[in-house]
Amino acid sequence: MIKGQLAGLMKQAQAMQDNLKKAQDELANVEVEGQSGAGLVKVVMTCKHDVKRLSIDPSLLADDKDMLEDLVAAAFNDAVRRAEAVSQEKMGKLTAGMPLPPGMKFPF
């Protein structure tokens, strides 16, 4: 009986690993948009943190360089937070609330 339970547990673990890998692959194609300056600066990135596009409203190009740099950084950080939220939501569904060690994040 224990052998059967262990085999079933191993099968479940393999299925979960396969599902997590599939979800990670899907997240590489999911895009999120971060914004700052009321949408004047936008960063589009995947949930794997690959930046796809950066959009800067032309009205900002004549303005203060430091302000523009701050807006780009803020938009990037907003995109990262959104990507992490989408990743956590998708992976959380797969782990069904399984607690993770402190500091461990998905995707691995």
UniProtKB/Swiss-Prot annotation:
Subcellular location: Cytoplasm, Nucleoid
InterPro entries named in the record: YbaB-like_sf, YbaB/EbfC
Keyword line: Cytoplasm, DNA-binding
UniProt-recorded Gene Ontology molecular function terms: DNA binding
Alphabetized Pfam families for the sequence: YbaB_DNA_bd
One GO CC term on file: bacterial nucleoid
SUPFAM superfamilies, per the entry: YbaB-like
Keyword Membrane (UniProt): no
Source domain of life: Bacteria
Keyword Manganese recorded: no
Similarity remark: Belongs to the YbaB/EbfC family.
Subunit structure: Homodimer.
Role played: Binds to DNA and alters its conformation. May be involved in regulation of gene expression, nucleoid organization and DNA protection.
Name of this chain's protein: Nucleoid-associated protein Lcho_1975
Organism of derivation: Leptothrix cholodnii (strain ATCC 51168 / LMG 8142 / SP-6)
Lineage: Bacteria, Pseudomonadati, Pseudomonadota, Betaproteobacteria, Burkholderiales
